[in-house]
Regions:
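Histidine- and acidic-residue-rich, metal-dependent catalytic cores
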Residues: 1-147
Length: 148
């Protein structure tokens, strides 16, 4: 039986790792074109998340998943207009709603990338909060690796 996600496989082939890294690098390239500060933010989040995962003694696959989630957590912002991205939160209520769609937009981007299935919920729900005040779904009592 084949894993549904490349993150589920304990032994990834070099070809699979190369494909994953190529897709991630292409997405990061698009992010950097959109905004250097957004790209740099994602690098910092990824480094901090990976360091935390290592400290927690998670498995190599979990560390890779968390590192990649940190890199791509805001990939949906490439779909948000520049004036909203650069002025948030000092924008209209309508533009705030556009901005708050970025987790879903990012998850939708990853849905078209084979092997990224494990990343999708981490991207989609990274702004959810325990008390339901997060977005985009206002979920309550959700706790994931992203919040640990």
């Amino acid at each position: 039986m084949y894993p549904t996600s490349i993150f589920q496989s304990a032994e990834l082939s070099i070809d699979d790792k190369n494909k994953l890294n190529m897709v991630i690098n292409h997405l990061l390239f698009l992010m950097r074109i959109k905004s250097v500060s957004l790209y740099e933010h994602s690098q910092r989040v990824s480094n901090l998340a990976a360091a935390t995962a290592i400290y927690m003694r998670l498995t190599a696959n979990e560390i890779t998943l968390i590192r990649n989630a940190g890199l791509l957590h805001d990939i949906g912002l490439i779909c948000v207009p520049n004036h909203v991205l650069t002025n948030y939160p000092y924008v209209s209520k309508r533009d705030i709603q556009v901005y708050k769609r970025h987790p879903d937009l990012g998850a939708n981007i990853l849905e078209s990338c084979p092997g990224m299935e494990d990343l999708i919920p981490l991207i989609r729900f990274h702004h959810e909060r325990w008390d339901g005040t997060g977005y985009p779904k206002h979920l309550k009592k959700i706790l994931s690796l992203i919040h640990i």
